[in-house]
Amino acid sequence: MFTLKKSLLLLFFLGTINLSLCEQERNAEEERRDEPDERNAEVEKRFLPIVGKLLSGLSGLLGK
């Protein structure tokens, strides 16, 4: 039981480090972007599918 706890703690620790490194890399990539057009395009890509799903859901509710 003790070795299981140790290995789980080790996996958690390594996963946390990996997540931290990924966040740092992502933040560095976001800082490298200088053009606001690229940021706007990325926001639109994230935003438009959500709006489409909401509108289709509302039209389904209103149509009944």
Swiss-Prot record:
* Listed GO CC annotations: extracellular region
Hey, what's the signal peptide range on this chain?
1-22
Origin superkingdom: Eukaryota
Describe tissue expression.
Answer: Expressed by the skin glands.
Question: Is the Transcription keyword given for this protein?
Answer: no
Which residues, in ranges, are excised as the propeptide?
A: 23-46
Alphabetically, which GO biological process terms does the record hold?
defense response to bacterium; defense response to fungus; innate immune response; killing of cells of another organism
Keywords for the protein's UniProt record, in alphabetical order: Amidation, Amphibian defense peptide, Antibiotic, Antimicrobial, Cleavage on pair of basic residues, Cytolysis, Fungicide, Hemolysis, Immunity, Innate immunity, Secreted, Signal
Question: What residues bear Leucine amide in this entry?
Answer: 62
Keyword Acyltransferase attached:
no
Tell where it localizes.
Secreted
The main place the protein resides is secreted
Query: Briefly, what is this protein's role?
Result: Antimicrobial peptide with activity against Gram-positive and Gram-negative bacteria and against fungi. Has been tested against S.aureus (MIC=2.0 ug/mL), E.coli (MIC=3.0 ug/mL), B.dysenteriae (MIC=1.5 ug/mL), and C.albicans (MIC=6.5 ug/mL). Can regulate or mediate antimicrobial response by stimulating mast cell degranulation. Induces histamine release. Shows cytotoxicity toward solid tumor cell line HepG2. Also shows a weak hemolytic activity.
State the similarity comment. Belongs to the frog skin active peptide (FSAP) family. Temporin subfamily.
Q: What is this protein called?
A: Temporin-ALa
Give the species. Amolops loloensis (Lolokou Sucker Frog)
